[in-house]
Amino acid sequence: MLKIYNSLSNKIEEFKPIHEKKVNMYVCGPTVYDDIHIGNGRPVVFFDVVKRYLQYLDYGVKYASNITDVDDKIIDRAQKLHITEKELATTYTNNFFEIAKKIGGYNFDVTPHATNYIEEMIKFIGELISDGFAYKTQSGVYFRVDKIKDYGILSNQQVKDLKTGVRIDLETDKEKDYDFALWKNTEEGIKYHAPWGDGRPGWHTECVVMTNEIFGGEIDIHGGGFDLKFPHHENEIAQSVAKHDHHLAKYWMHVGRLDLANEKMSKSLGNDIKLKDLVQVYNPNAYRLMLLAHHYRAPIQFSDDLIEQYQKAYDKISYTLNKWHFHMILNNINENGLDHESMEYFEGFMNDDFATPRVISLIDKLIKDLNKAFKVENYNTIIQILSTLGINPNILEVLEDDIQNYNNWQQARLEKNYEKADIYRKPLLDKGFI
């Protein structure tokens, strides 16, 4: 029985999707004005694992993750680079997809782009105005937060205590400081025509509209980074309640930050490490292993020592699996049985709010056991668990030359011709087969 921590209730709950054996999941994706940093990659990896494990449990999963390709940051960056917003957004969208594939996280079924849903956003905003949940001003359209009785339910705040967030504009013509923008009238950058003025949609409206357009109603899981809980996700809930009289999602899942030297990593602060740069130095599987060795809700303090630790751990896994794969080929072992006790442990850990650190410890134990005494069930179990975690060690193909080198090596050893034996042994060592 899968149990997950629901940020909406602040407690562990049994996972019961709205429709039996079918899961709809939406995760907030990047604003494509720059390459993602190593902290941005954490939700990409985690929710990929969520989808993989749900599929392992025989759920059908539809997974959407958006691309925010209209935003003030995109406009500012494009102007500085003297290119169009579309050119900038296209470049960094392609870069994001490329790095997501490299870290094994390109497991999306739908990747909606905000610019493809502008008409739907304008219609949505117009209906909120008609229903009294939004109002027009000279600067744009704003949402009346006071109209939502349980506003603050996700972030555990009361309206009277609200502080405006980073992405809430402090416009002087708002009714209340904490009202948030649905539409921003502007003369600068890319803009669209709407009945209340030319401009562009607010960030919070983009996601709620795309979620509704793709799934047509309440979804099972809405996810993202912990820093999106407020104001972004709170404001998505408010709009959904106003328009549809129900919450946007049944379960909300938030991933902890990855910080650099105890400081929040941020592109705007200029203290970020680009993920594309990290995986040029370290194996993408080592990055993934590092993330999964920490519980998804816990913060991670990144350092060179930390990633190097998991590079070594991954190298050990890869070497062990290659060595025993070669052994299986040599001895014509092709059984596909699993160690059922270990698989029960695996499922128990994953069912406990995706306790991946305990799964990584289980893998470490199985690797140690395998190196003590070969059991094909242990080998197959490690492969199965790693696959479900999206970690794919580079298992090398065993060629006829490799088998011949092994046989020649053994023969030379029998003949006590150690110089000749070393010649045949070296290519096997280079491949990690012995």
Swiss-Prot record:
Gene3D superfamilies: Cysteine-tRNA ligase, C-terminal anti-codon recognition domain (1.20.120.1910), HUPs (3.40.50.620). It is found in: Cytoplasm. InterPro entries: Cys-tRNA-ligase (IPR015803), Cys-tRNA/MSH_ligase (IPR024909), Rossmann-like_a/b/a_fold (IPR014729), tRNA-synt_1_cat_dom (IPR032678), tRNAsynth_Ia_anticodon-bd (IPR009080). GO terms for biological process: cysteinyl-tRNA aminoacylation. A motif ('HIGH' region) lies at residues 30-40. Its cofactor is Zn(2+). Its EC number is 6.1.1.16. Keywords: Aminoacyl-tRNA synthetase, ATP-binding, Cytoplasm, Ligase, Metal-binding, Nucleotide-binding, Protein biosynthesis, Zinc. Zn(2+) binds at residues 28, 207, 232, 236. The keyword Transport does not apply. Its main location: cytoplasm. Binds 1 zinc ion per subunit. It is an enzyme of class 6 (ligase). It catalyses: tRNA(Cys) + L-cysteine + ATP = L-cysteinyl-tRNA(Cys) + AMP + diphosphate. One of its GO terms (molecular function) is zinc ion binding. ATP binds at residue 267. Pfam families: tRNA-synt_1e. The keyword Cell cycle does not apply. GO terms for cellular component: cytosol. A motif ('KMSKS' region) lies at residues 264-268. PANTHER family: CYSTEINE--TRNA LIGASE, CYTOPLASMIC, CYSTEINYL-TRNA SYNTHETASE. Monomer. Belongs to the class-I aminoacyl-tRNA synthetase family. This is Cysteine--tRNA ligase. The gene is cysS.
